[in-house]
Amino acid sequence: MLSVGSLLPDIHSARLIMISKTPLPITVRRMDFDIPELPRYWYKGNAWTTHFMNALSTTFPDGERFFIHAVRNYEKEITDPELRAQIRAFIGQEANHGKEHEAFNQALIDQHKLPLEKKLIFMKKALGFAKKKYSRREQLALTVGFEHFTAILANLMLKQTDVIEEVQGMTADMFMWHAVEETEHKAVAFDVFTATEDDYWLRVRGMAQATFFFLLITMRMQYSLLRHDNQLGNWRDALGFAKFLLVKPGMFTRIIPEYLDFYRPGFHPWQHDNRHLISERVKELESYALRAVNAA
């Protein structure tokens, strides 16, 4: 377990004070989820919402590797031992997220013959292009934006547990584990950026670009999967998906205040302190990991 403190004792440097605001341990958990036989439309039987979640999962493996790459580019420049420990924990967690979502994506391919291979190749090429086109500071700003996006979505899942709990078995456990760990490390990339670049306009530009790419890629993949399943004309599920986004749980509408707060000068992710939401979830994850070890 890697533990990180709350504030550095150096009160003379505003930048150093900003570095270590993560107020809880960042724990690397190797879960090894056993993906069960899934219904084709595993999210409440809704094709549109299921393929939205499938599209999210498809972006994760190479997305997580891109985030690791962007943060690792700056690792040698960080001298603060607490932030260096956070970086190592961040890398460990993100690597495990990529591995588990790769297994989940492969299960979708094997069980339902979903055409994810081309989409995974597209993600790899798109992020390879980003590494070539964007400078390392732009890559880090983009990562900070994506990390905030995933953190506020994770916060919604933790606050409104029915988002995931109505999904049965290991699928629910995997997404909740991901939400817990995205919360634990939500400030790491931000603090690396603050310690090395600290450029407000670069930060907000990175968030705007991350938003554009997130919506474009996710919606493109969802559309493709719906077309493959001949579900584009399923208006009942389309309306159910609209309710999912806009009403209950309000996957998009309820994150708007936290999303907009990112654009405020002086913002820090832990100004949205949601430690209380993960304490019980952490106990559940530790119990699950212990059961998995005993069963092995």
Task: Label each region the model flagged.
Residues 17-296:
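Non-heme di-metal
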Residues 1-17:
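N-terminal amphipathic/basic-hydrophobic helices that include classical n-h-c signal peptides
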